[in-house]
């Protein structure tokens, strides 16, 4: 047996996005601005839904959890990324890396299933309006929220355990801005085909299962909309689903490019850009999509502003 002098990795070094000093300044303030908008937009959405009784419906119950998931997924990556931009040593501990990968994967997988639950909610609201309150009971809504977290927990726990049980005995430099699974697998001192196969199967299963629920729901919704006689009725039904369709298209498109495509199909630079999109941009965009295209949210916000002006003016 060949004797190898190997060093066990106890921490990782993140290369980040750039070493150019001016680019660092621009990126820091840009990502800080985006992160603050993400926190403000999603916390604002959660608060508005919480305090306005007219928004205490299943649709906004799911939207509140979607905003929570967006805050958590962004917060698992962005603060550490901001700290590392100007850091001399962009290190992260072995356990810290595992925790970051676990939390981010958990909330991203949960978001996929939450979007599927929201699609089912829209299906019931448009296709079975008379049975809506009966079908979408409080118990069913809780199950449709707990289920995504449970399935995401199982999937992410599997990936994290499989990844961090691998031996890391060579380079500890991760050519990325956070602990993502593909850059980590490239550092392992063992064959990772099992990990990649499990990742492909589980990520594919999450995408296919949630995607099928969304697709079937919207096929039924489309068929129902086409049967509506009035143009106003069709327009109202369409705009009810527009925000959700936009959020689904953005998230699933980026996650498909990252996790389901073959690893050699794009360069590392494009991989980082796509990763930035779903770690930084999507959590910021979601509350904007759901508020700007949603009359009920805009009306609720307007009512709170007018009430505040009335109280101040008294």
Swiss-Prot record:
The chain crosses the membrane at residues 25-45, 98-118, 144-164, 168-188, 197-217, 238-258, 269-289. One of its GO terms (molecular function) is odorant binding. Glycans are attached at residue 5. Disulfide bonds join 97-179. PROSITE patterns: G_PROTEIN_RECEP_F1_1, G_PROTEIN_RECEP_F1_2. Residues 1-24, 119-143, 189-196, 259-268 are extracellular. It is found in: Cell membrane. SUPFAM superfamilies: Family A G protein-coupled receptor-like. InterPro entries: GPCR_Rhodpsn, GPCR_Rhodpsn_7TM, Olfact_rcpt. One of its GO terms (cellular component) is plasma membrane. It is a multi-pass membrane protein. Keywords: Cell membrane, Disulfide bond, G-protein coupled receptor, Glycoprotein, Membrane, Receptor, Transducer, Transmembrane, Transmembrane helix. The keyword Membrane applies. Residues 46-97, 165-167, 218-237, 290-314 are cytoplasmic. Odorant receptor. Belongs to the G-protein coupled receptor 1 family. This is Olfactory receptor 5G3.
């Amino acid at each position: 047996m060949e004797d190898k002098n190997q060093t066990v990795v106890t921490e990782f070094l993140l290369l980040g996005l750039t070493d150019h000093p001016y680019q660092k300044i621009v990126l820091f303030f840009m990502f800080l601005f985006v992160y603050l908008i993400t926190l403000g937009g999603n916390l604002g959405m959660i608060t508005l839904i919480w305090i306005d009784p007219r928004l205490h419906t299943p649709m906004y119950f799911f939207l509140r959890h979607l905003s929570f998931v967006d805050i958590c997924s962004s917060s698992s990556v962005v603060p550490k990324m901001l700290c590392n931009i100007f850091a001399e040593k962009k290190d992260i501990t072995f356990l810290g890396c595992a925790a970051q990968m676990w939390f981010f994967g958990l909330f991203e997988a949960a978001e996929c299933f939450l979007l599927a639950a929201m699609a089912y909610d829209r299906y019931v609201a448009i296709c079975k309006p008379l049975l809506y309150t009966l079908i979408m009971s409080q118990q069913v809504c809780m199950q449709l929220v707990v289920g995504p977290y449970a399935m995401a927990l199982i999937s992410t726990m599997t990936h994290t355990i499989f990844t961090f049980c691998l031996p890391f005995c060579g380079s500890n430099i991760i050519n990325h801005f956070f602990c993502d699974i593909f850059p980590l697998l490239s550092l392992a001192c063992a064959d990772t085909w099992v990990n990649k196969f499990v990742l492909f199967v589980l990520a594919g299963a999450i995408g296919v299962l949630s995607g099928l629920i969304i697709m079937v729901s919207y096929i039924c919704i489309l068929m129902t909309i086409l049967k509506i006689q009035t143009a106003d009725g069709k327009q109202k039904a369409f705009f009810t689903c527009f925000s959700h369709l936009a959020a689904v298209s953005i998230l699933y498109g980026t996650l498909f490019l990252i996790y389901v495509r073959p690893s050699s199909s794009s360069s590392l630079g494009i991989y980082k850009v796509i990763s930035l999109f779903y770690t930084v941009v999507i959590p910021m965009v979601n509350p904007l999509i759901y508020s700007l295209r949603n009359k009920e949210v805009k009306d609720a916000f307007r009512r709170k502003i007018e009430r505040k002006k009335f109280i101040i003016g008294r």
